[in-house]
């Protein structure tokens, strides 16, 4: 009888420890700005994060052994601040690699290439080049690569600064701006989802190409290496190609 009690106690102890282990999920906390479709945005009438970057990060995290990704929604201009103070382990938010950002954070290998383009009202014409923006009211999202490019290539007095790409489009539609400079992948999605009757691309070319990557804290070299190992494999997979088709319509 005593032996049976010992066996039962051992079983209960083992079961309890197993239960504790299951409760301790390995969670990857990631900063993002969820107002940049199709990269990251909120599902309508929901608190669910969706988008290309969201799915990409979940897939990478799973490959790296994480049980869950916890996304932290932060204003775009404060994303790197939060990474430096370690509020999260990584940032994914359509973030282009720039020398200024590289001085503060470490970037993974790029996972997609994007580019800037001019968007203008339907029925108007404008060459898709920097010279076209002279004396034009140009809408652009604050703290973005587009903002930096516009500041260097246009009259600063004519810039209409917005908090999102969608706000910039609305500024053009409402005649608060003559045109906008924006991520081509992002605006292509918006044009396909409700804005094609109002605005259009100025041309098929791009003004400036940029590479998009995940940012991590400079001292977290282990996490950076893990991301790069999985990106090398994932970005050549069928899953990645399907993800691109889902959000961009074709392989980029």
Language model: regions and residue ranges:
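Extended ligand-binding regions for polar small-molecule ligands
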Residues: 54-64, 124, 131-132, 136-137, ...
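Short helix-initiation/N-cap motifs at beta->coil->alpha
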Residues: 69-81, 125-126, 145, 160-174
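Periplasmic-binding protein-like
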Residues: 34, 112-120, 184, 188-232, ...
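A ligand-binding cleft/hinge motif common to bilobed small-molecule-binding domains
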Residues: 78, 94-104, 152, 173, ...
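A conserved helix-loop-strand patch within extracytoplasmic ligand-binding domains
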Residues: 66, 95-97, 109-155
